[in-house]
From Swiss-Prot:
Family: Belongs to the PdxS/SNZ family.
Underlying gene: pdxS
Name assigned to this protein: Pyridoxal 5'-phosphate synthase subunit PdxS
Single GO molecular function: pyridoxal 5'-phosphate synthase (glutamine hydrolysing) activity
Subunit structure: In the presence of PdxT, forms a dodecamer of heterodimers.
HAMAP family assigned to the protein according to its UniProt record, in alphabetical order: PdxS
Amino acid sequence: MTKILGSDPVKRGMAQMQKGGVIMDVVNAEQARIAEAAGAVAVMALERVPSDIRAAGGVARMANTTIVREVMEAVSIPVMAKARIGHIVEARVLEAMGVDYIDESEVLTPADEEFHLLKSDYTVPFVCGCRDLGEALRRIGEGASMLRTKGEPGTGNVVEAVRHLRKVNAQLRKVINMSHDELMTEAKYLGAPFELLLQIKTLGKLPVVNFAAGGIATPADAALMMELGADGVFVGSGIFKSENPEKFAKAIVQATTHYQDYDLIARLSADLGEPMRGVEISELAVQDRMQERGW
């Protein structure tokens, strides 16, 4: 069967090629080159990393197209970029620019509080965040080709990413072990398409890859998420807000690849300098929690 450009198999296949790797947020060409040299499988081009977006407040939008273009020209690995939830034109602009992936991201200020993008209408593949299986399947139903935990971006605190990944995986196990006649009721409970639950039961897993994101700040954090079953990791502020970005980037890539080699992770964690400053989640007001954006 001929594979059609923009079809689900093609778009999901692109995400499969990133499996086991690290995707790093970058704000300029120099950072993109550091990420590529460290072994990142892709970079996410944006104007400000999540911790700076959080600190600045106000409205966070799609990155200036000049930044996205400079990053695309600087590296040979895939380049992703963020669009606001529901912002059709930002997504179309990024698609026209030729980015490899679009992240419909809660890190940016949502443009639409009711509707997410219909991602199946685009040729470019999308990645979306999720906190549970219901969110995951709603995004896949809209056409997402890749998932990531929402976590709590820009905090350097991995606890929410752990919570979200564990919840998705627990709900997956529940669905896989259900009888077929129970799936429709579970679909109603989750607010998710029945056909996707049936697909999960048949496959024994999600139909797309699910990376960990939101608060990953150290090599041990990255290894933890892989240990818990993530297909790879996104690192936002954790690298370029650390004391030594080059060393942190290389160490996180190695820890992700060799996540059960604890002696290696111990060596990688030595003499790295200070990681990014962390934020306690309980100190954040609900309206300041990016994970609450979208549904």
